[in-house]
Amino acid sequence: SFLCNRKLRSYYTKTFRGDVQLAVRYIMLCIPHQGASKQNVRRIMEAGSQKRAPVYEALEQLKKRRVVPFDVPGHKRGRGNPELVELLGEKCVSLDVNSMKPLDNLCHPVSVIKEAEELAAEAFRADHAFFMVGGTTSSVQSMVLSVCRAGDKIILPRNVHKSVINALVLCGAIPVYVNPEVDKKLGISLGMEISEVERAILENPGAVAVLVNNPTYYGICSDLRSIVKLAHEHEMLVLVDEAHGTHLYFGEDLPVCAMDAGADMASVSMHKSGGSLTQSSLLLTGKNVNWEYVSQIINLTQTTSASYLLMSSLDISRRNLALRGRESFRKVAEMAEYARAEINDIGGYYAYGKDMVNGGSVYDFDVTKLSVYTRGIGLAGIEVYDLLRDEYDIQIELGDIANILAYISIGDRIQDIERLVGALADVKRLYSKDPAQMLNTEYINPTVLVSPQAAFYAEKKCMPIRETAGKICGEFVMCYPPGIPILAPGEMITPEIIEYIIYAKEKGCSMQGTEDPAVEHLNVLVDDRQVWK
């Protein structure tokens, strides 16, 4: 039919920009199974371009030329630091090079980095994509700084990563918190309910943006499409912290991703579920954002010596996800669901999932997140976390007061899942305690009295933590991971929060953010009357 029907042949040849062979390939492979939809046309066209990895290819060409380096870095392809070569390998160290014309420059990309960013934008369905080498922390901060100026209001949930509040300290914007509902059993914050977002928007019509977590660390998703629609109706931008959502762009039957929901900007941790090297990330922008201005904001804080190891890993990982991501994340979801069922069969644990969805505070759930409630066996999540590492050589992502999180991704195997399940069964058998002895604690939403910037730079004094109730905090206090502040600058310290911090320390949570490494003292504002209205 394609060869004989001139009209049909003309249509598909035009659709594939004159590439007759590609058109024939599409007709033969796709139509019998999927139909000739515009979406399938786009998929096969993108698959062709997505096979490229411009930064990686440029590095390979450079290596073939055997260039003699009289530039930095000073290890000179590893020759000046043999121990580094022994640790990382000759090829890795030889590709740790500086910016040069054939390799482009991240601060002002015009060739291979520009091409790689364009391919990333295409793969993630964004208008523009930026390679970020300072982690998603720098991506989130650049996103907020691009939108907010001193005195601007931004609507956001309190359970944001510390990078968001750090950005408010830098730019002087004012947080308007939509405090999500807290699950009293699990002790975690849930998603932003659309009614609460609407209330915050109506009460703060001058706010410039709404920021959303998609998903949270624990897999909870808000109704992102409705939030975007509501914010845009009130001429506000929508920023999405998608640090834990790379896979949402490629997997099937997963929660909606930021760009598909119509969000204006999204920070995506490629190194978490996307397979790139630690510290590599993406910042995505939509059509409503001036990406040239965003580029200027990024360059205020981004290094001028960007790592080509990180950038090439972003390039290669994007290619891998674009070509094989759908199948990869189907397997990831299957492994996570299998693990969830097996862990729940042990008894005592609660591996939560889609059963939490209620259409409101839990609008959707990311099934790739293996979040497990542990207090049912009388152990805090951090205690199970430590036992798995110290006694079973299993390193999981997170342990808090009530939960653990095992991160399942494209590098996991079913035998690894079996080992984790077996270890959890063993932990219950050997180490379980009476749950009645557990302190009943949950995440507490603090009251903001002073803007983060004003509090951070205010005159402060150091006090023993047990004596700080009623004072205004002048620094961050958090468990890491997840890096969500228990207290941030400008928030009221209460007896309940003090109890939470002390209990988390006693259970072994890794505390950080305070000037005092032991977290025995807190910096508080000297002038308690300095209340921001």
Ranges and model annotations:
Residues Q21, V41-S111:
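N-terminal "arm"/small-domain region of PLP-dependent enzymes with the aminotransferase-like
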Residues V93-S138:
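Conserved N-terminal alpha-helix of the aminotransferase class I/II PLP-enzyme fold
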Residues H128-K153, A167:
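Conserved beta-loop-alpha segment that forms the PLP phosphate-binding cup at the N-terminus of a helix
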Residues S317-R340, D416:
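Structural signature of PLP-dependent enzymes
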Residues Y338-G513:
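Conserved C-terminal alpha-helix-loop-beta "cap" of PLP-dependent enzymes
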